[in-house]
């Protein structure tokens, strides 16, 4: 019998404002995520706004996979608080460097991952609609689920696996490498 595994994916999206001569994907991504988060807060719970906060009590985001924290390794505030929406379904919608990204909630099988990935696509559609309502036609935001913007920036979709924190890093490398190859 197979051991149940917690899994999920993170999908990176390309973003562009096609009518602008100069692109600022960080700003456009921030507008997109914030517009969706603000709309979701105001339309939830009978119109009473509330925010799901990111809890770092059991997290050390500055640590690498070995658990080491180099001096000055704290993530920028923008990666942890400013443009980061934890959604009601457990997914996360955020700006990852210079593009919008959605991570699924923890899932119990591949079918559930696919369902949440599809719901992420719908969230992006709604986010574009809400953001574009606040922008001029020249500032329209368009998001693509692809893997390259044609200017050297590439995007992707990556898997996530739950691993016990007590597992030695060398064991992860030994077994994960075999699994991925």
Model-assigned labels for residue ranges:
Residues 147-164:
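Histidine-centered divalent-metal-coordination microenvironment in nucleic-acid enzymes
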Residues 1-144, 153, 173-181:
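Terminal catalytic/cofactor-binding subdomain
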